Amino acid sequence: MDSIQQDRLSSLPDILLIMIISFLPLKECVRTSVLSKRWRYLCLETTNLSFKESDYVNPDITDAEYSRIVAYRSFFCSVDKWVSITQHQVVESFEICFSHLVGFEDKIDALIEYAVSTRVKNLVVDLSNPSWRSNGDISYRHFMYTLPKSVYSLTTLESLKIYGCKFDPSKFVNPVLLRSLSIGWVRLENLHSLLSKSPSLQSLSIKNCWGVDITSMAGQFRELVIEHSDFSYMQCAFELPRIHSFKYSGELFEFYFDVVNVIIPNVYLDFGEERVYDLQSQSSRISGEVISRIINDLRAAETLTVCPYILQVIPECEKPSDLLQPMETRHLVLRTKMHTKEFNGIILLLNNCPNLETLGFDILTPCPFSATSSDEGIDPKTYWMQKRTCKSLRKTLKVVVIRNFCGSSNELNVLRYLIRSASGAGDALERVELYVPNGMEESQAMVVFAKAEMLQRTSKHVQVLCAQLLKK
């Protein structure tokens, strides 16, 4: 930090400086104590406490049992020291992230009791293991910590995140201020009881849970996220009149939206956990009908993101063009492998988005293969050369974006079709953005950029831009 910046900060009162450093990670907050005498003790008054195993324990030593135990003890020694010197400070946010619980249950208990005693507004208890990838990674061999009873009576909570920790939602006494709830890596029963007591809840996230025993959900949620979770029942009805963002990832699960907004800003659907199949069957036709009905319920989505499985199955139902209703979608994102099995689904969605302004393709494989043989009557060489009229392509589509663009023949054929279909009638299409994946060899990237230049030369009224995809 240079002298000018220090002078500017020095002119601020302590209360503002404390507010500023409270937004920093705890380790960065502590480092401010060396700036000057005035800063020496300000970090002790931070209102946000976050103790993460990853900030203190070197992952390279986790293979050695003795070294690992020593590192964990050192972690809790540092945490205990910090808590002891800030006993009477105001704490608004408290976070503990620790994955190796055996032998340290009392330490976790003490930290959570400390957080409760400060009447925190935001509490994070994340005891999940970073190595877990699915619910199958958790077995009887994994110790599951039980949340202390004192948390249930904490009425100041506005945000609560519980991962890898046993708890009973029905035991919460009066969570009237709770606005954000995130639950993961746990058997989730009696959730309805907690939701019914939380009139202020606006954001709900359920990730990698099992035994979720709800058949209906109602509330004033603005955001609902459900990822890779197993429900006890086959159906669930949602009555969410104020929903702004809905994200579902996991196995095909039949859910209904009874009441929704006139416009839903964002909907994300990913049924990628369903089995890949080669031939159309009665099962795939039924799946297509279920997904089409779900999309119809969410047809007010302003931005809609779909997965390859959706693109493959929705054309397989009986009379798919009659089953799927016109949507209000203005921004459509297709997560695709650019396989011929997905082509009919792409056309079907384009035909049902008459107001489409932005069309995105997220290529899931770094370099999608180029199919050269026909697949169920679909020839990738000629499919996009056929006359297929989509109203939105001629009148409203302005921008096409492809991420992880590798210049495959399937990608180029789709682009040529879109540009050709958009020509004339006002030339609504203005720009095509192509993003080459990171890590591509320079020689291969040069070929991809050359293909983009060729596309530009054949597209008079459309600007074609090609760039490297930035790392997230």
Curated annotation (Swiss-Prot):
Q: Which Pfam families match?
A: F-box, LRR_At1g61320_AtMIF1
* SUPFAM superfamilies xref list: F-box domain (SSF81383), RNI-like (SSF52047)
Q: Which UniProt keywords apply?
A: Leucine-rich repeat, Repeat
The answer to whether keyword Nucleotidyltransferase applies is no
Repeat region (LRR), residues:
58-87, 135-164, 183-208, 225-250, 283-308, 338-363
Query: Does the record's keyword annotation contain Heme?
Result: no
What InterPro entries does this protein's entry cite? F-box-like_dom_sf, F-box_AtFBL13-like, F-box_dom, FBL60-like, LRR_At1g61320_AtMIF1, LRR_dom_sf
Q: Where is the F-box domain?
A: 6-54
Name of the protein: Putative F-box/LRR-repeat protein At5g54820
